[in-house]
Regions:
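Ankyrin repeat A-helix N-terminal signature
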Residues: 130-135, 164-170, 197-202, 228-235, ...
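Ankyrin repeat structural motif
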Residues: 136-144, 170-178, 201-210, 234-244, ...
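Aromatic- and Gly/Pro-enriched helix-to-coil junctions and flexible linker segments
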Residues: 13-138, 142, 156-160, 164, ...
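Sec-dependent N-terminal signal peptides
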Residues: 3-12
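Preference for long, amphipathic alpha-helical scaffolds in soluble/luminal domains
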Residues: 186, 251, 339, 344, ...
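Ankyrin-repeat inter-repeat connecting loop/turn
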Residues: 150-151, 184, 215, 249-251, ...
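Ankyrin-repeat-protein effector appendages
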Residues: 122-127, 245, 280, 304-327, ...
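Ankyrin-repeat boundary/"N-cap" motif
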Residues: 121-130, 153-164, 187-194, 218-227, ...
């Protein structure tokens, strides 16, 4: 489930070698981008890409001929179906590596052929892990004392009970287990060791190192303990400990594709870790472009200055500029331009830095002005081919946010638009809450079921929100397709299971993991709505979330994702992550998770919303926290104050009211206790009833800069269907929460 890696991946610093080495150059690309859907767990379209015989025998790869190799065609274009991976194409440099390798004869060493089936899991080891998860430490220790060999036996995903003890117990217990013979260097099926799982905890890391743990062990996904330690905010003490024990600060040949400790420290916005790494020899130029993007995204000015002082290549600044422009940091944009960044360069998706600046919800006029002053073409056209923004000009993109100062200034500067066609909409003339929900649920469930098989991943917009809406409708007496609902729960859990080992390492995607918390938190909230019981998968998400929380209590999420509103939530990520911990925190460390929840609630109480989307999330987060009534009431008043005369809300003040913003705002207010008799409540309900389409959907215009190849998931509204599905889910959630006494409330005429 590689959702967003492409956005943050840079250009490989080294040219494709004359002779491509499979283990060094090809295998990491396959593991990070393909094997989750075409590996031992599942083989989409019958293709398995982790085993030599399966790839060669089915002509996935024809040695010597990329032209006749299906793998090459599927990753390089859409002639044989949607370009793979479904979450977004890999970079041109990586495609060229695969092509060159095939044309050179596809040399795949037998030592990496992966032809031997893994041994079965040990049922006793699996039972020991379950004992740990449920808090039965005495039972676990009894089993270990009876047969110490079980500590090193194959448990879930090949991980040993001792590895799981690293997650669920403390240093004292681990010391006892090591004395019994636990092996700190035993590897699971992904070549992960106990030290990698311990690398976010100083004392556990110290203990394992003292008992001979390999400080430079590397997983199949090219991660080392140091890479994992550097990703956690405020974890510089562990970074230093690992470096002191000989950890390599430059473990990967291609850090822009495989990550590096420096990139992860920048992603965490951790200046102390970055300074340590650079002081110990971390190669700044090799990681510079991506590290620069991450440091700017996290708002760490000291981190940016540290990198800029290292004389990065002009190409690094050029590659980073599009995402930096989107972040609305005029000083960072100036820094990139002053270091030679090409102001008119198209990124691999076919867009210029000015397009990203125009697309940002931050509406930063100073950034737009600076780019134009430095020569940006105000009439450049978006040449991205796989989304609804293809062919749009800079002005078209800016207008997606309404009539803003950015739009007005661009027009004065000579920017031209293309007058994109408006959708043909037909709202219901008569509607009730009951008929509205009965009309929307079948659409949501259909799109929910269609999305995962086509995308090979679960989404917030089509899956998690649909689960929440479906469960809410059911709980209020509406019929839903129970077979589809159960099927989707299984699909979401399977997605988490594939990610479980990633999350134990503290990652959701291989590189640039800024948005992972919002995605997996949505998944847990959706699963809870369907009454899913806690298990190893939900525990892994909770551990991942806890490891990513910043010391001040937030889950830091700058506007670093070009898919507003869903993945650009300043306050929303913290609200959702906190809620996920409330619902699924592991039993074994309740006090620590309670502290994380309290810290998040305190942060939200003082957080300052940047827009209406933030205001809605702040109300919802504080209502979920349930601790600070005064802060919750104040947040409710602030949200109510920006309700429009038509009864709706908009994400931004410059935009029209939408079902997405209105449904979410009303649901937040309902959760916080807004009375159904309140006039604002009634106006919001009437807005939703009056804007539902005859087919049962609500239409929301997308303003996201697409990076995933578009496909039809069976929801109305074409290129705008994914955000429209999300808006329909929020509207359905809000309407289904209406009290029974208001269920027949009707809207007639317009």
């Amino acid at each position: 489930m590689r959702v967003c890696t492409f956005l943050f991946a840079g250009i490989l610093c080294a040219q494709t070698p004359a002779k491509v080495d499979f283990g060094r150059d090809v295998l990491p690309i396959l593991r990070q981008n393909c094997v989750s859907c075409h590996g031992p767990a599942q083989q989409n379209s019958g293709m398995r890409l982790d085993r030599k015989s399966a790839v060669i025998s089915r002509r996935g790869v024809v040695p010597g001929s990329s032209e006749n190799s299906m793998v090459f065609h599927r990753i390089s274009g859409s002639a044989f179906g949607m370009q793979m991976p479904p979450s977004g194409p890999i970079r041109p440099e990586q495609i060229n590596v695969i092509k060159t390798w095939i044309d050179q004869g596809a040399d795949w060493p037998d030592s990496l052929a992966n032809e031997v089936e893994l041994p079965p899991l040990n049922s006793k080891a699996v039972a020991m892990v379950e004992a740990l998860r449920t808090g039965d430490l005495p039972g676990f220790m009894k089993s270990a004392a009876a047969d110490a060999n079980l500590l090193n036996a194959r448990g879930p995903e090949g991980s040993t009970p001792f590895m799981y003890a690293v997650l669920y117990t403390g240093p004292a217990t681990l010391a006892r287990l090591l004395k019994l013979g636990a092996d700190p260097n035993k590897r699971n099926d992904a070549n992960v060791t106990a030290l990698m799982w311990a690398a976010t905890d100083l004392e556990k890391t110290r203990l394992l190192l003292d008992h001979g743990a390999d400080v430079n062990a590397r997983s199949s996904d090219m991660r080392t303990p140091l890479i994992i330690a550097a990703r956690r905010p405020g974890n510089s003490s562990v970074v230093k400990l690992l470096l002191d024990h000989g950890a390599n600060p430059n473990p990967n040949a291609h850090p822009a594709a495989e990550s590096s400790p420096l990139i992860e420290a920048a992603t965490a916005g951790d200046f102390a870790s970055m300074e340590l790494l650079i002081g110990r020899g971390a190669e700044v130029k090799a990681s510079g472009e991506l590290a620069l993007e991450m440091a700017v995204g996290m708002g760490c000015s000291k981190c940016v200055a540290l990198l800029a002082a290292k004389d990065l290549d002009r190409e690094a600044y050029s590659a980073a500029l599009p995402n930096i422009a989107f972040l609305g940091d005029v000083n960072a944009v100036k820094l990139a331009l002053d270091h030679g960044a090409d102001v008119n360069a198209f990124d691999p998706l076919g867009r210029t830095p000015l397009m990203y600046a125009a697309a940002s919800d931050l509406l930063d006029l100073d950034v737009v002005k600076l780019l134009v002053e430095r020569g940006a073409d105000v009439n450049a056209k978006d040449v991205h081919k796989e989304g609804g923004d293809s062919g749009l000009t800079v002005l078209d993109i800016a207008k997606l946010h309404g009539d803003t100062p950015v739009v007005q200034w661009l027009i004065k500067s000579g920017a031209k638009g293309t007058s994109p066609s408006s959708p043909v909409l037909k709202a219901r003339r008569e509607n009730t809450i009951q008929s509205a929900i009965r009309g929307s649920i079948p659409l949501l469930q259909r799109a929910d079921a269609n999305f995962i098989p086509k995308a090979a991943c679960a989404s917030c917009h089509n899956n998690s929100l649909a689960a929440m809406a479906t469960a809410s409708a059911r709980s209020h007496g509406f019929q839903v397709d129970e077979k589809t609902a159960a099927q989707q729960v299984k699909a979401n859990v399977f997605g988490l299971e594939k990610l479980r080992d990633y999350m134990h390492q503290g990652f959701f995607v291989p590189v640039g993991d800024l948005f992972g918390p919002v995605v997996v938190s949505y998944m847990l909230v959706g699963l809870d709505a369907e009454h899913y019981k806690a298990d190893l998968n939900t525990d892994a998400v909770a551990m991942y979330l806890k490891a990513h929380q910043s010391p001040d209590g937030q889950w830091a999420y700058p506007a670093a994702d070009t898919r507003p509103p869903i993945c650009s939530d300043y306050i929303g990520q913290t609200a959702l992550s906190m809620r996920a911990l409330q619902l699924y925190a592991p039993k074994t460390d309740k006090a620590a998770y309670d502290r994380s929840i309290q810290l998040a609630a305190a942060w939200m109480a003082t957080a300052r919303p940047k827009n209406n989307d933030d205001r809605g999330w702040r109300v919802l987060g504080l209502a979920w926290a349930g601790k600070d009534k005064l802060a919750t009431q104040k947040a409710m008043r602030e949200l109510l104050a920006v309700q429009r005369a038509d009864g709706g809300w908009s994400d931004l003040d410059s935009m029209e009211s939408s079902a997405y913003a209105t449904g979410k705002a009303l649901f937040a207010l309902q959760t916080a206790g807004l009375s159904a008799s309140d006039a604002a409540y009634e106006r919001a309900v009437r807005f939703l009833l009056s804007t539902q389409q005859e087919d049962g959907s609500w239409y929301v215009r997308s303003r996201a800069m697409a990076f995933q190849p578009y496909f039809d998931a069976g929801f109305p509204h074409g290129f705008d269907q994914w955000i429209s599905a999300a808006g329909t889910s929020w509207a359905t959630l809000a309407l289904s929460q209406a009290s029974p006494a208001r269920m027949t409330m009707a809207m007639k005429g317009r």
